[in-house]
């Protein structure tokens, strides 16, 4: 048994692999086989179940059930703009003891299509353990 599992699942439709591919290239010391001509990102990156609303909740439910049996605590990070909404989290957490912490920070609005985005994003940290 371990003391803590930290979970930071994808919040939206963008898979982590496409965001962090350069770290993987460095760590593996291997050039990707096929790369997008537009983005330079390897084409083989696939979305996970956490990148889709319909599968994210059930996948998270399964991950929590597995994790709570392996660790005393789970620390989960997720923001208020994520695919899984606050009401969904409340339902997921019904069978656990939860402490919730919130941190507000400035939203990233680098492109024009994000100009209507809220100024602040709320990062929620959930400390989870069995009841």
Residue ranges and their predicted role:
Residues 1-131:
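Class I S-adenosyl-L-methionine-dependent methyltransferase catalytic core
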